[in-house]
Amino acid sequence: MIEIQQIIENAWDNRALLKDKKTTTAIREVINLLDIGKLRVAEPTSNGWQVNEWVKKAVVLYFPIQTMETIEVGPFEFHDKIPLKTGYKEKGIRVVPHAVARHGAYISKGTILMPSYVNIGAYVDEGTMVDTWATVGSCAQIGKGVHLSGGVGIGGVLEPLQAAPVIIEDNVFIGSRCIAVEGVRVETEAVLGANVVLTMSTKIIDVTGDEPIEMKGRVPARSVVIPGSYTKKFAAGEYQVPCALIIGKRKESTDKKTSLNNALRENDVAV
């Protein structure tokens, strides 16, 4: 793997090497390893999440070495550089028409894809539901048992290389039409109510205590979150700016499904 990594690094610094067969073979090998889950753009470590920049470089370099091709699926036709993912039956994945995933995205067994889209470099772990019109962007990392509700947008990131992708950890519930972009991390078992929008600059305010606690870029584990707003002064006057409010917690002690249902009911959260 070290040899492949060095080939990728050399090609990144010298694009003329993209004409060499050794380079193109190495790039395609990385994409194949991403496709089967043997490599990841980002992975959990004992010190938090680690971004593998060289893998992201391989994904970026994959585009210029590919040629446009017509892809025919029954009466439907596509024209693109990246092939579609295949072999769902053998992988134990349920795919409802017209869900689409690109080659180079890993999707684990027991996952359900309703009509949705999963981009190259993404990692979708076991037992996750990607609901209708949800999108999983390039290199996004989705954990086990996650529910991405209808119309959810999980942003992708290829560049800048050092930027972390959006990370949705295990057993998270993301409500309808939520958006998470710019490397936001939603930690284990958190619940996002419908229409929550999270960017790296979005204020996430914990209002469960006597005083508000502000944070950005991270939703703590088991938090129950709804959309909110705060007042900000501008030259033209005071206006409301969107934020996210932490209004409660899922209980650790109960069954995951039970704790989810209780959290939604107790906090009156729409999903």
Residue map of PLM features:
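Terminal amphipathic alpha-helical/low-complexity segments used for targeting or macromolecular assembly
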Residues: 1-93, 222, 227-271
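Structural signal for interior beta-strand "rungs" in well-ordered beta-sheet cores
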Residues: 93-233
